[in-house]
Design a protein with these regions (language model features):
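Feature captures the catalytic ectodomains and active-site-proximal regions of enzymes
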Residues: 1-153
Length: 153
């Protein structure tokens, strides 16, 4: 576990620990993990500060780190990129007021299978639907309670 930096507010260090997390994961690529879950908190935590320029820097940092990770892991892992809520994508309302709270906007969902096979996904899915695709990747049977929950068409 790599700790977040000790700063009063994250707009002072919008990159947080993203580069350290990325470097550590790349350094441990050869460990052969079955599953890796990574959370870049930058866009969320910096978004809460209301500082647009810092939020832009946070998004650029995460974009850079995801690109580096994709280039290393794309041939060995299925990759899912998503979020559980928005924040940094909408920081100013129609009246010019600063927004520091989570949004209810749709978030991206990217599934990049290492096999590059084409998979059709629902247009309107929910966070609960992500579990189904993770179970498929890990070749684990879906519990009966999840019968209606799938992001795959």
């Amino acid at each position: 576990l790599i700790p977040s930096p000790k700063v009063p507010t994250y707009d002072l260090k919008p990159e947080m620990s993203a580069y350290e997390v990325t470097d550590t994961l790349i350094k441990n690529f050869d460990k052969g993990f079955d599953f890796i879950l990574l959370n870049f908190a930058n866009c969320d935590m910096v978004g809460h500060t209301g500082r647009l320029s810092a939020a832009i820097s946070a998004v650029e940092t995460v974009d850079n780190c995801i690109g580096r990770l994709y280039n290393v892991f794309k041939d060995s892992y299925d990759i899912i990129i998503t979020a559980d809520h928005g924040n940094a994508e909408e920081m100013i309302d129609e009246n010019g007021n600063i927004i520091t709270a989570h949004t209810t906007n749709k978030v991206p969902f990217l599934y990049l299978p290492r096999t590059l096979k084409e998979i059709k996904l629902k247009d309107n899915a929910y966070l609960r639907d992500v579990a189904d695709i993770v179970l498929r990747i890990l070749d684990i049977d879906k519990p009966i309670e999840m019968a209606e929950s799938s992001i795959i068409l």
